[in-house]
């Protein structure tokens, strides 16, 4: 499967809010390190980046769905066009979505070896990016979040490289199912235990599962999805 590469640096998304969501196509070979693409940056180190969130993949398949969603609701044009890199992804391609990709999947991308570690957790910066106050919530509910990956082996990646599946150790745990267990379904102890015990799932997501099991209440996603009061859109 052919993959497009994107990278970017932190810039001001709106006054007072810096983000590295603005990505540009990578046009020359780039080194993929354990921290991600060499030319890429994460502005919010607390919620982005790190060894388990080195890369973000977003399916190009979804862009037509978003355009249809916008048109069907009669919404104004988004601040950012519906096209690859709009969601701040590093990797994008056609033919692989959250219903097919699985936690723990290992792929060869150029010389690098990468592994799916967790679904993406949408945040309020997407609302500002597109100009829709409920964008992050729709993304979470629809399951069109994309996913994050860790780098198992560093290596060079060329533009328009191909990504090939090497191993799928957990075919029962798709990215979509993983996201639904935490985001979109009632508390299910067996499902939460499955997440907690999966060694390929990121520690952050395993902790979310542990917390829900221990406390019996779902996490409050409001601040992540909507942001501070001063930055909320109607």
What are these regions (language model features)?
Residues 28, 145-147, 161:
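A short pocket-lining beta-strand/turn micro-motif at the edge of beta-sheets
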